[in-house]
Amino acid sequence: MKILHVAHFFYPCLSAGGVVNASYQIASKQSKDNDVKVISSDSCKERLKFPNGRYDVDVRGIKVDYFRNISNRFKLATMLDTPLFAPFKIRKDIKKYEIVHIHEHRQTLAVIVSYFARRNNIPYIVQAHGSVLPFFQKEGLKNLFDKVFGFRILRNASCVFALTEVEKEQYLKMGVEEDKIEIVPLGINLEEYENLPSYGRFRSKFNVGSDEKLILFIGRIHEIKGLDLLIDTFNDLIHNGNDGSIKLAIVGPDDGYLSKLDEKIKECSIEDNVIVTGPLYNEEKHEALVDCDLFVMPSKYESFTTSGLEAMACSKPLVLTKNNHIHDWVDGNVGMACEDNKDSLREAIEKVLFDEKLSQTFGENGKKLINEKYNWDIINKQILEIYKNFI
């Protein structure tokens, strides 16, 4: 099968969030038995640079064309690409492919590719990755984009992938026909979790005792992640008879909120109990997951949490707010889901953190669910079967 993936950020720009990892994992799995190409841009916090100035490169076995943006600063400010020569190359090359898979539709490359795909009767699929509705940030710009391009891109798609039933309802609100919507979740690469690091490495590096409880957050340091709520809750937690026996580790790249986070930690005078590591990848991230007692995701909005799946792969229980669209199958099964307030979050954390039997049960259930459902081997088979319906 000849497949084209379109992603406005792509590996190695992991700081751009979970969409980069998802699009990479899907393309990587498909490349083993199919002819796969990815087109993306050179944007990241700092422009991506390539050997010998080539922008058509091999990324771990995946053929990728990175279009150079006229302005990286404009891309980061608006999330809109300004890709040099993209229309000319895409117009020429689009006929090579049997199907197109667009990751996030509010991007210039999606406009260009969807247009030429339609002109050449090539089916395309849209996977919004939690960005179906235009809200939270840059709402005015998103609404304008939708009026000019977005609605057309979604409605003309052969199929759209929803992460959850909640996202399915969002597609319906955007005018997508119900029979075009498929539920396709996110997953993890099981191979990356076959040989985990031994317990204690993260704790040793960051001075966390073996007798201390460790709560872990992994994600972008962004306002939407609910870190203000997490700090307020943790402040209450350690001053409720647990001072000195609990540590909180916050792992992830700054996405505009780090200075406010640091300020809030200082205001609460909990610097000795909170560890802010910055981004950790691969082995170092696995060390944090192995050493934690509980994974927490207090987001104000979250369609799916890949880092939560990673914690489940390490047999760790989850606590998340009901703002996360997966809360229905998490709650009482692999962790606890709570309301978006301090008292509810603290109660959920305490219930899981200090009940070892419950914590172990949640962890075992999570690991089983990863092996049975939420891994890229299974999900990729589902995606390929969907592709075949349109070729």
Where are these regions (language model features)?
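N-terminal subdomain of nucleotide-sugar transferases
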Residues: 1-52, 60
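Conserved acidic donor-binding segment of nucleotide-sugar-dependent glycosyltransferases
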Residues: 332, 336-343, 351-357
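Nucleotide-activated donor-binding/catalytic signature segment of Leloir-type glycosyltransferases, i.e.
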Residues: 260-280
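Nucleotide-sugar donor phosphate/pyrophosphate-binding loop at the beta->alpha transition
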Residues: 123-125, 133-156, 169
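Glycosyltransferase donor-sugar binding loop
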Residues: 188, 218, 246-260
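Aromatic "clamp/platform" in nucleotide-sugar-dependent glycosyltransferases that forms part
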Residues: 300
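Conserved donor-binding/catalytic core segment of Leloir-type glycosyltransferases
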Residues: 4, 209-225, 231-234, 249
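Short hydrophobic beta-strand element within catalytic cores of glycosyltransferases
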Residues: 317-320
